[in-house]
Swiss-Prot record:
Start-end of each ANK repeat: 1-30, 57-86, 91-120, 124-156, 158-188, 192-221, 226-255, 259-290
Source organism of this protein record: Danio rerio (Zebrafish)
Family annotation (Pfam families): Ank, Ank_2, SAM_1
Lineage: Eukaryota, Metazoa, Chordata, Craniata, Vertebrata
Protein name as it appears in the record: Ankyrin repeat and SAM domain-containing protein 6
UniProt record, GO biological process: pronephros development
Length: 739
C-alpha cells in the first residue's frame, strides 16, 4: 500500500527497529526515499513507482505512530527531525487529528509541544477538537478545548449558508431570511473587510441593497483593503439605479478612498462613463459644497456676533475656491479701455503727443453701480492709501487693501504694455515695391525726385524697429528667384555710402544690400538704380524722424552728377561700424568666422572703364564685369554677412575657404544642393578638417534660417501694407530727365 518499512515499524511500536533504520539512512518523513534506502525489491522505486506512491495514501511513519498511539515511536521520530505539523496530502489530516481520533492524550501533548497546530482543519473543515467531539474522546477534548481558537459550529449552522454565499447565489429571499434571523449579519465583514451592502452594490442587486438599508446597514462603511464604500462600488461598476438609491439615502459623496479618490473621481476614470451618472454625482457634489459654505458662513456670523471681533478668513485652499474668489473680483471690475495694443499685429507707434494713460487709471472697482474713473493715476502711495480707506477701491467690498494691491499688480504685470495706445495714428508711407520695368534713370532725375519728395515727409516717432523690416521682406521676395553675381567693386558716387549694414534695424533692411537688388544693376544701370533705392531708403528714414538726431550728411564728390548723401544714420542693433566705403569697412558680422581681411582703399578700375563711373549702360556693363570681385569688396552694404542670394564661390571666399572650391566644382554642387549638405556629406566630399566643416555648416544653417524668417516677415508685411496703402502719402514723381 505504499507504506515503508519505517512506517510499518513505527505503526507497531518497534522502537529498536525504528532506531536501527534511522541510523542506517532511512528518511523520516519521505516514504519514497524510505523505499529506496531500504532497497525493497517488492516496492522497487523507479520513475513510475514514485508517481504511483504519490497517488496512494502516502503513509508516513509519524502519522502511523500517532494514529496507533505509539508514544515512544513518536518521540523517537520527533527527535530525529520529523515535522509535528506534517499532514496527509489527500485528506488534510494531521498527526494531531489522528492522535485525537485514537484518544492518545500523551501523543497529542507531545505533538502540541513540538509545534503542531490545533486550529488546522482538514478538507471537511474539522479541527482536532471537532474530531475528538465526534468520537467522544473526553480527555483529548478537554485538553484541546483550551488551546483551540476555531470553535466548532452546530449542525444547523453548518447546513445554513452565510449571507455572502446567499449574495453570490443572488437569492434575495435567502438573504432576507438570514438577516431576519440574525441582525448582526447585516454589517458582517468578510476577509477583505467588505460588507454585504458592498457586495450587493457590486452585483447591482437593487432589491438586496434596499433590504440591507432597511435593516440599518452602514451606508458609508469602507472596506479595510482599499477604503471603498458601497457608493464607490456601484459607481465604478456602472450600477446607476443603486447609485441613485444610495444618494437618496444620504450616502456621503465626499468620502475618499485610500488613494484619495471620491466616487466622482472613479466615474471619471471610466473609459465610457454614463453621462447621466456623471451629472448626478456632479450636482450632488455642488450641493454639498454650497451647504458647507453656508454652514461656514453661519458659524462665522455667530462667532462674530458673540465675540465682537472680525471673523478669521475662511479656508481658501483649493483650485475651485480660488477660481470662485477671482471670478467674483473680476465681476466687480470695470475696464474703461481694452488692451488692443498687445494683441494687435499693427506695429505702428502711437501719436507722439498723445497723453500717456497709465493702466492703473483704467481700472476702477464699482460698488452698487457707482462708476469711478480718472484720466490720471495718483502716486503709488496715495493710491494704496485710498484703497485702504474707501470701500469702492476694495475688490471684495470689505476694504481689503492688500488684496486689491495684489490684484492690481497682477493685472499691471500681465498687461502687454505699461500704457495704453492712442487711437490716432499718422499716415504711413507704403513700403517700396519695384515696378514691373525700370526706366533709364539719370542722376539729375534722381536728385530732383529726392528734393521733391523730401518736402512732403513728416516727422514721426520711431516704432519698435519694424518699419524697415517690412520693406526688407518684400524686396527680398521680389529679387529672390533671380541671382545676379555682378557687384561693382570700385566706389561710385551712388552706392559707395548709400547702404547700411544688413544687421541695422532702422532702414537698412528696406534696401537689404547690393546683392539683394542686383537685378536693378542689370535692368536700368547700377549707379542710377542704386541711387533711386538709396533716396527712397533715406526718405523713409527722414519720415521716421531719424535724420534729425544724427550727424550731417557727407556728399561724395562727383564732377558730372548731382551729389548724393554718402552716409545715412542708422540704428545699430549689434554695435557694428557702418560700412560707408571700402576703405573703412571690415567684416564684423557675428554670424560667421573668420572674417575676410580688409581690402585696399581704392582698387584700380579696368582699362576701358573710367575711375568715376557715369550712369546708364556704362555702369551696367561695369557691374556685370565685376563678378569675380564681389565678395572681397566691403563697399556698399556688403558686411561679411552670408545671405541666400550669394553664390557658392562667394560664400567660400567670405569664409576664406577658396581652396575647397574645386571640390564643389568637381562634384557639380550647385547652390540648391549646397543648402542640403550635412557634416557627413562634407566629409565624403573630402573636407576632413573640423574647422572648415563647422564654418560651412554654420553658413548653411544661416541661409536656411533666413528663408524661414523671410516668409514670416513677408506675410506680416503684406497685411500691414494692404491696410496702410490707402492712407499713405502720395508724392508725384519729378519729370523724367533724358540722357
Amino acid at each position: 500500500m505504499g507504506a515503508s518499512v519505517l512506517a510499518m515499524a513505527a505503526r507497531g511500536g518497534h522502537t529498536h527497529t525504528v532506531k536501527l533504520l534511522l541510523e542506517n539512512g532511512a528518511f523520516v518523513d519521505d516514504c519514497e526515499h524510505a523505499c529506496v534506502s531500504e532497497g525493497n525489491t517488492n516496492t522497487h522505486c523507479s520513475a513510475g513507482s514514485v508517481q504511483e506512491a504519490r497517488a496512494l495514501l502516502e503513509v508516513r511513519a509519524l502519522l502511523a505512530a500517532a494514529q496507533h498511539g505509539q508514544g515512544a515511536a513518536v518521540a523517537l521520530l520527533l527527535d530525529w527531525g520529523s515535522d509535528a505539523r506534517v499532514c496527509h496530502t489527500g485528506t488534510g489530516w494531521s498527526a494531531l487529528m489522528l492522535a485525537a481520533a485514537g484518544g492518545s492524550l500523551s501523543v497529542c501533548q507531545q505533538l502540541v509541544e513540538r509545534g503542531a497546530d490545533p486550529d488546522h482543519t482538514n478538507v471537511l473543515g474539522n479541527t482536532a477538537l471537532e474530531v475528538a467531539l465526534q468520537l467522544r474522546r473526553r480527555d483529548v477534548q478537554k485538553y484541546l478545548d483550551n488551546i483551540t481558537s476555531v470553535r466548532p459550529r452546530p449542525d444547523d449552522e453548518k447546513k445554513r449558508p452565510d449571507v455572502f454565499h446567499a449574495l453570490k447565489l443572488g437569492n434575495a429571499q435567502l438573504v432576507k431570511e438570514i438577516v431576519e434571523q440574525d441582525a448582526a449579519q447585516v454589517d458582517v465583514c468578510n476577509a477583505d473587510g467588505a460588507s454585504p451592502l458592498m457586495m450587493a452594490a457590486v452585483s447591482g442587486q437593487l432589491e438586496v441593497v434596499q433590504l440591507l438599508v432597511e435593516k440599518r446597514a452602514d451606508v458609508d462603511r469602507q472596506d479595510s483593503v482599499h477604503g471603498w464604500t458601497a457608493l464607490m462600488q456601484a459607481t465604478y461598476h456602472g450600477n446607476k439605479e443603486v447609485v441613485k438609491f444610495l444618494l437618496s439615502q444620504g450616502a456621503d459623496v465626499q468620502l475618499r478612498a485610500k488613494n484619495g479618490y471620491t466616487a466622482f473621481d472613479l466615474v471619471m476614470l471610466l473609459n465610457d462613463p454614463d453621462t447621466e451618472l456623471v451629472r448626478l454625482l456632479a450636482s450632488v457634489c455642488m450641493l454639498v459644497d454650497k451647504d458647507k459654505s453656508k454652514q461656514r458662513g453661519k458659524s462665522a456670523l455667530r462667532r462674530r456676533a458673540s465675540a465682537g471681533t472680525p471673523s478669521p478668513p475662511e479656508d481658501k485652499t483649493g483650485l475651485k475656491s480660488w477660481w470662485n474668489r477671482m471670478s467674483n473680483r473680476f465681476r466687480r471690475l470695470k475696464l474703461t479701455h481694452t488692451l488692443r495694443h498687445g494683441l494687435s499685429t499693427n506695429r505702428l507707434a502711437p501719436f507722439p503727443d498723445a497723453a500717456d494713460v497709465p493702466l492703473d487709471a483704467t481700472m476702477r472697482a464699482e460698488e452698487g453701480g457707482a462708476e469711478v474713473a480718472s484720466p490720471t493715476a495718483p502716486p503709488a502711495g496715495a493710491q494704496s492709501t485710498a484703497c485702504s480707506r474707501t470701500e469702492d477701491c476694495g475688490l471684495n467690498g470689505t476694504g481689503s487693501g492688500k488684496e486689491d494691491f495684489l490684484i492690481t499688480t497682477m493685472l499691471r504685470n500681465g498687461a502687454p504694455l505699461a500704457r495704453l495706445p492712442s487711437e490716432q495714428l499718422k499716415a504711413v508711407i507704403p513700403p517700396f515695391l519695384p515696378p514691373s520695368c525700370f526706366e533709364p534713370w539719370s542722376s539729375e532725375r534722381c536728385g530732383s525726385l529726392r528734393d521733391a519728395r523730401s518736402t512732403h515727409t513728416h516727422s514721426q516717432r520711431p516704432g519698435r524697429s519694424s518699419a524697415g523690416s517690412d520693406t526688407a521682406s518684400i524686396s527680398r521676395v521680389v529679387n529672390r528667384s533671380i541671382k545676379f553675381p555682378s557687384i561693382t567693386k570700385g566706389p561710385s558716387p551712388s552706392n559707395s555710402g548709400s547702404y547700411n549694414s544688413a544687421h541695422s534695424s532702422g532702414g537698412s533692411n528696406g534696401v537689404g544690400g547690393v546683392n539683394r537688388h542686383s537685378d536693378t544693376h542689370n535692368r536700368s544701370g547700377g549707379s542710377a538704380a542704386d541711387s533711386v533705392l538709396s533716396q527712397i531708403a533715406a526718405q523713409r528714414k527722414r519720415a521716421a524722424g531719424l535724420m534729425d538726431s544724427r550727424s550731417p550728411a557727407v556728399e561724395t564728390p562727383s564732377p558730372a552728377h548731382t551729389p548724393l548723401p554718402d552716409s545715412r544714420p542708422k540704428l545699430e542693433l549689434q554695435k557694428r561700424p557702418q560700412s560707408g566705403n571700402s576703405s573703412r569697412s571690415k567684416s564684423t558680422s557675428p554670424t560667421l568666422t573668420p572674417s575676410p581681411s580688409p581690402t585696399p582703399a581704392h582698387t584700380p578700375a579696368p582699362a576701358h572703364t573710367p575711375a568715376h563711373r557715369p550712369t546708364g549702360a556704362s555702369a551696367d556693363s561695369q557691374g556685370s564685369a565685376s563678378t569675380q570681385q564681389r565678395s572681397r569688396s566691403s563697399g556698399g552694404s556688403s558686411s561679411g554677412t552670408i545671405t541666400d542670394e550669394d553664390e557658392l564661390s562667394g560664400i567660400l571666399r567670405k569664409l576664406s575657404l577658396e581652396k575647397y572650391q574645386p571640390i564643389f566644382e568637381e562634384q557639380e554642387v550647385d547652390m540648391e544642393a549646397f543648402l542640403t549638405l550635412t557634416d557627413g556629406d562634407l566629409q565624403e566630399l573630402g573636407i576632413r578638417t573640423d574647422g572648415p566643416r563647422q564654418q560651412i555648416l554654420a553658413a548653411i544653417s544661416e541661409l536656411n534660417a533666413g528663408k524661414g524668417r523671410e516668409r514670416q516677415i513677408l506675410q506680416e508685411t503684406i497685411i500691414n501694407f494692404q491696410s496702410s496703402f490707402g492712407s499713405s502719402a502720395s508724392t508725384p514723381r519729378a519729370a523724367t530727365h533724358t540722357h
